[in-house]
Amino acid sequence: MKTNRILIIVAAAVLLLTSCNNGHERMLTIINEDGTCSREMSFHPYPNSVMASSDEPIENDGLHFGADWQRSWSVVGDSVCHPIPLTQEQWDSLQRVFPKQTVRDKILMHTKRNFQNVSEMSDSLTSVVRHLFKATASLDKHFKWFYTDYVYQETLAITDIEQIFSVPLDRFVSADTASYWFTGQPNLADGLTGAEQKELLDEIEANISHWFNACTMAFVYTYASLRYDEVKNPPVSKEQYLALKDSIVMSPAVRNMDLFSDISQVSKIIKDFYHSDAYTPLFSDSKEWERVLDKKYKSYEYLMMMAPQLDYVMPGKVIDAGNGVVEGNVVRYRFSGERLIPHPYDVAITSRVTNVWAFIVTFLVIILAVGSFFYYRK
């Protein structure tokens, strides 16, 4: 069987081998004092996306945009945005300018939309991503006379994660270890030497790899049961076969698999477990299994490809950026899809707007009070 494209992508994402932000793709969120907001997403587009008319729905790496999103494009590093659609002539011209690179890597598509409130905005993001994903957001205003605090919170999460990973992650690593591997927090390597850090990471990587193998094996094993009536002289009944799934999934043989680069590995494990080759024909069509696995992991592939920098602009001055970093008037959050695996991803930002009018009113009240005091003393 040829190495499955989706499995390579998924494996790389899970093992954090390719989970770096290219620095160009981002999601800019602007919160206004009146509660209205806007969101702009910038990403490298495929030709059919950037060449589509503004009233035509588009899909780009699993992101879905309708006609209610304003669209434009720009060359990477250039602040000038151009209207869509980009023409074939423009695409060819850009290819001549960048002969050794793909045009897609040298341009960005920008999609922007305004919202009445942050709830509407988060619902829209859920619709854009769609695949096993949900966003929720809230904005609270706290009036304190001389100033008003704005507290913005947003949570990004994977929904129904068991659709992809049916075997619980906590059977392989602790909650803190999983969080450290996928998000970097808590820092379990704090105080360790370089050699000790490598030993720790090697152990975690082996356990995460085992978990992924187990989840994939569980899916393949269960999916094969749908064709159980094709098995000639099975060593056990279908009910017994399914009941023994956990024993297969958690076996040492699964731990050492090469992430299903060859479906015959699955067949061999099952054959060795049951001491029978009755199930071997179920795995004879490698191309069919490639299609099955491709479909299984497509939604997850899209999630793992998400790695935009999250930028937030709040009203007034930011006084608490949470886990973000303040750069000028922008709060930046580092984000990538695999960070959603152990737990939801939280954004929490508090900003403060000075109420100038409150100072003026207070000053006038003081002046009136002092004036009244001296007036009545006369």
Could you describe each region identified by the protein language model?
Residues 7-9, 174:
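Generic signature of intrinsically disordered, low-complexity, basic-rich segments
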Residues 16-19:
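C-terminal motif of bacterial Sec signal peptides marking the signal peptidase cleavage site
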Residues 70-366:
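Mature, soluble, non-transmembrane domains
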Residues 21-93:
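Start-of-domain marker
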Residues 52-55, 64-66, 336, 357-360, ...:
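Glycine-rich loops and low-complexity Gly/Arg-rich segments
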Residues 367-378:
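Juxtamembrane interface at the cytosolic side of transmembrane helices
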Residues 1-7:
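Bacterial N-terminal signal peptides that target proteins for export
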